[in-house]
């Protein structure tokens, strides 16, 4: 009995909430003068709680008591700001190397050039995934391959919370497709539990406050579509009962 309890305890301890977010270029960063720009700070509110922050992902991380953040971004994304934000004792030389690299990169740069950026987040809660711009099918296929690396960062039982506030608008669609494939075809029992969006565009109508919108209805629609397919094709109503 004790062995079973220890096994259950170990399984529970491995389960975690993981934020997956997209990282943009942060239009307020002055790369030429190496100014450490960032997203504009605002007062986010979610579940009747307020958080003053620049990153929606950081708000979600704290609000849901997550374990780590997987940031998906290009070589031009503001990794320097993320480094400043999440590394306990930032090294100015490391930051400068990141900033200079970002400034020199473009859409044609090979993703392997960003290996030093990835290494700079070792032993932190940040897990970077580098992607291309997705300008054509070849780049989109490469991005899909990159996103499959997320599977290695997840443990069985993990809950995924997706933040779609920033980054290229096409990427959340690609991400959800990849995650659904991982969920259906890999042995890890992971699930997407939430999709959120920081609606900064209407903060001027909300007295400067920015709502974090819950888009879980999309997950429900997807689940219903799957259940309908199972029922119509195989007469299986089990998923409906869930």
Language model regions located:
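Conserved TIR/SEFIR loop-to-helix hotspot centered on a Trp-containing motif
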Residues: 171
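Short glycine-rich or small-residue beta-strand-to-loop segments that form or flank ligand, phosphate
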Residues: 160-166
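Short glycine-rich anion-binding loops that position phosphate/pyrophosphate groups of nucleotides
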Residues: 25-26, 166-168
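Long, low-complexity, Lys/Arg-enriched
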Residues: 2-159, 174-242
């Amino acid at each position: 009995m004790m062995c079973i309890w220890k096994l259950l305890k170990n399984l529970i301890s491995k389960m975690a909430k993981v934020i997956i977010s997209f990282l943009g270029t942060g239009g307020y960063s002055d790369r030429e003068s190496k100014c450490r720009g960032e997203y504009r700070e605002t007062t986010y509110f979610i579940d009747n709680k307020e958080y003053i922050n620049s990153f929606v992902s950081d708000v979600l991380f704290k609000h849901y008591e997550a374990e780590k953040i997987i940031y998906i971004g290009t070589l031009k994304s503001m990794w320097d700001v993320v480094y400043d934000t999440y590394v306990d004792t930032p090294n100015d030389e490391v930051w400068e190397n990141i900033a200079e690299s970002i400034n020199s990169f473009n859409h044609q740069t090979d993703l392997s050039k960003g290996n030093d950026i990835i290494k700079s987040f070792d032993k932190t809660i940040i897990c970077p995934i580098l992607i291309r711009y997705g300008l054509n099918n070849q780049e989109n296929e490469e991005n899909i391959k990159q996103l499959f690396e997320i599977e290695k960062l997840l443990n069985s039982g993990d809950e995924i919370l997706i933040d779609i506030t920033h980054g290229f608008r096409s990427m959340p669609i690609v991400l959800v497709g990849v995650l659904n494939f991982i969920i259906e075809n890999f042995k890890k029992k992971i699930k997407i539990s939430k999709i959120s969006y920081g609606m900064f565009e209407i903060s001027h109508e909300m007295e400067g406050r920015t709502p974090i919108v819950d888009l879980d209805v999309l997950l429900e629609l997807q689940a219903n579509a799957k259940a309908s397919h199972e029922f119509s094709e195989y007469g299986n109503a089990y998923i409906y009962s869930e």
